[in-house]
Amino acid sequence: MFKVKFYIRHAVLLLCGSLIVGCSAIPSSGPSAKKIVSLGQQSEVQIPEVELIDVNHTVAQLLYKAQINQSFTQFGDGYASAGTLNIGDVLDIMIWEAPPAVLFGGGLSSMGSGSAHQTKLPEQLVTARGTVSVPFVGDISVVGKTPGQVQEIIKGRLKKMANQPQVMVRLVQNNAANVSVIRAGNSVRMPLTAAGERVLDAVAAVGGSTANVQDTNVQLTRGNVVRTVALEDLVANPRQNILLRRGDVVTMITNPYTFTSMGAVGRTQEIGFSARGLSLSEAIGRMGGLQDRRSDARGVFVFRYTPLVELPAERQDKWIAQGYGSEAEIPTVYRVNMADAHSLFSMQRFPVKNKDVLYVSNAPLAEVQKFLSFVFSPVTSGANSINNLTN
């Protein structure tokens, strides 16, 4: 019996010695906090591989404000279309002349209408010079004028030639003051009228969203400025439903947002969230929180590709000096120390983005426990077997 215990003791010592040398081979759910932090500590001579940023109130507020700026209210409410004419518009012109008709007694499309003689001119396209042509009047400049103003001009010029002329000008095809509305499977050009069309009118013009409302974003492009708002926010907040302007492009984007949770969080999973967005505190709640026995509260990380222009100014200079352009996306790791109570406030302002990876590192004590379990499980099992044989 003494020999058996002696052999077991020596087996334990030999196994411990061999496993301590190769303890890095212990299975783990991911890198430790120390290894992740070392990613941002590259030599100054080399191009840095990762931008490591500690999340504090200032960093969280900057990211929060950048998200808030994705608002249609930044464009201003604008104004309704004045209904003025422009190049490419098509006009319908009708002329009435009291009998006896002097100018429009025949020829063009004409008919009697009571005691007046009615003449319908062929549809007139506003030329590149901004004019339309009317018989006996000649070319008339119409760009920037309303149909009512144009008909008064024609009527005034015909008075000296026709018998009590009356004129009606109608816009039949608005090719200039319109908005492009783009959606998968259905895109239209929506004309703007004096009624004042808004963003939700454009959404309705293409039949709304083909997906769930919470998975749909609405993007508005005006000139060189692009803003994106969740359809949920657009419906819930009337201030976002601004008036559209000539040349605007409204695009409906259907793309379910997700982030991936990894590390000491129970199991790796992809978690969906609304296009309205998600804060880091909400994301950790959806992950089920941190595991008390495994996770390192000081090692909560968010991995994402961040546009260079969204980094703090002093950090942008470092990357620009290494040859990165303004359009580059920088691999960035945001570190959160949840052991600090202040971080709980920062996390409520820190926005999670589509395709983010949230990683929780293992606590050092959890690694020790895993190591001890890995070492002593086979020895204990072997000892039990030997004891059974001895008995």
From Swiss-Prot:
Residues 44-57, 94-117, 146-148, 172-178 are extracellular. Residues 23-33, 68-83, 128-135, 159-161, 189-391 are periplasmic. It is a multi-pass membrane protein. Residues 1-22 form the signal peptide. The keyword Lipoprotein applies. One of its GO terms (molecular function) is polysaccharide transmembrane transporter activity. GO terms for cellular component: cell outer membrane; pore complex. Pfam families: Poly_export, SLBB_2. The chain crosses the membrane at residues 34-43, 58-67, 84-93, 118-127, 136-145, 149-158, 162-171, 179-188. It is found in: Cell outer membrane. InterPro entries: Poly_export, Poly_export_N, SLBB_dom. A lipid is attached at residue 23 (N-palmitoyl cysteine). Keywords: Capsule biogenesis/degradation, Cell outer membrane, Ion transport, Lipoprotein, Membrane, Palmitate, Polysaccharide transport, Porin, Signal, Sugar transport, Transmembrane, Transmembrane beta strand, Transport. Its main location: membrane. A lipid is attached at residue 23 (S-diacylglycerol cysteine). Involved in transport of capsular polysaccharides to the cell surface. May function as a membrane anchor for capsular polysaccharides. Possible porin properties. Belongs to the BexD/CtrA/VexA family. This is Capsule polysaccharide export outer membrane protein CtrA. It comes from Neisseria meningitidis serogroup B (strain ATCC BAA-335 / MC58). The lineage of its organism: Bacteria, Pseudomonadati, Pseudomonadota, Betaproteobacteria, Neisseriales.
